[in-house]
Amino acid sequence: MGETVFAKILRGEIPCHRVYEDDHVLAFLDVGPLSRGHTLVIPKEPAVTLDALSDDSAAAIGRVLPRIARAVLKATGATAFNVLQNNGPLAHQAVMHVHFHIIPKPSADAGLGVGWDPLVGFDHGEAAVLARAIAAAL
């Protein structure tokens, strides 16, 4: 993994507004927030994408992500939020270090806007083959 802004934050070379830290995870406010309280949750392990993250780091994030989300909601007064996690440039990952966005959604206009354009023509036969392939890859 190349040098990232998150690596510099983890080393203390760039300041951040920390909201949580333990041995495996750091959470801090996003400097380009989509809404008030937009928080980034990152592993201290230098993995680029979620599939490259160790099980231990993934478990550490999984344990604290709900807790941090509850704190963001309480502090901002929002009642809805999105959790966003992008993997790779095609998926709009801007910083090549695994990170989760907790983005409060205080109103219809504020926060993350999401469009959903599902594939047309779901094929159950193809889905069965794909499901077996995914299960076999586990």
What is the predicted role of each segment?
Residues 1-138:
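HIT superfamily nucleotide-processing domains
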